[in-house]
């Protein structure tokens, strides 16, 4: 079952080395049934190309407020409000310290920040930076400020960093972002809080101590029902 089926996701990518994980995140979102549109900051294009992301998302990638979209080289305005209203939720991954600071102070000097400020949907933020940058009081203050706005912080993970250090600051892995989204989505699902008992596999009914009546059920139907119920919040 497509656990994100029909959901519209606006993925914002800022200029971090972790941007190389963005194509995988796009693929996982689509695999789960979501429709994905991508917004790149100018610095993000130093790490990942619009061509890659448009190929995977099957949608044009937005990089600036205006883009050339016709043969006469006439610039066309990218409507950030329209993009934000289209989305069921926004994911900013990776979110650099600079982007987080801009979001916290309501700056609007690129298309991604304009989309963020126009958002009426849940916004998920996945910080990505070096260990000491992540721990800096100013950055922590900005993250707490975003939380106070109602944004959801996808906590950075610990591990090897691009600087060679080891510690907290890595962007949450794409597979874990997907798990978090699905878990959050379950709060809206129709079977949330319901307990369902499903039997699966072959059954045997004794005739006597030696013989029985049975079947060759594989249990696949029961397992599929259990998976579907789980995906609906049970």
Whereabouts are the PLM-identified features?
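A cross-family phosphate/adenosyl-ligand binding-site feature
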Residues: 1-124, 130-219, 223-234
């Amino acid at each position: 079952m497509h656990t994100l089926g029909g959901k519209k996701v606006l993925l914002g990518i800022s200029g971090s080395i972790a941007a190389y994980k963005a194509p995988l995140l796009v693929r996982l979102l689509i695999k789960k049934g979501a429709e994905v549109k991508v917004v790149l900051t100018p610095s993000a294009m130093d790490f990942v190309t619009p061509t890659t992301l448009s190929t995977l998302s099957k949608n044009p990638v937005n990089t600036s407020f205006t883009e050339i979209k016709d043969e006469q080289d006439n610039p066309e305005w990218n409507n950030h409000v329209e993009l934000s209203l289209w989305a069921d939720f926004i994911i900013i991954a990776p979110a650099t310290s600079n982007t987080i600071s801009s979001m916290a102070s309501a700056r609007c000097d690129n298309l991604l920040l304009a989309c963020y400020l126009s958002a009426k949907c849940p916004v998920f933020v996945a910080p990505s930076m070096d260990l000491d940058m992540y721990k800096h009081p100013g950055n922590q203050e900005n993250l707490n400020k975003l939380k106070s706005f109602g944004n959801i912080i996808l906590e950075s993970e610990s591990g090897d960093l691009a600087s060679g250090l080891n510690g907290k600051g890595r962007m949450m892995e794409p597979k874990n972002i997907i798990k978090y989204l699905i878990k959050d989505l379950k709060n809206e699902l129709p079977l949330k809080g319901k307990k369902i008992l499903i039997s699966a596999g072959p059954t045997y009914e004794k005739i006597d101590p030696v013989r029985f009546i049975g079947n060759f059920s594989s249990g696949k139907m029961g397992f599929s029902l259990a998976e579907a119920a789980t995906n609906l919040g049970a």
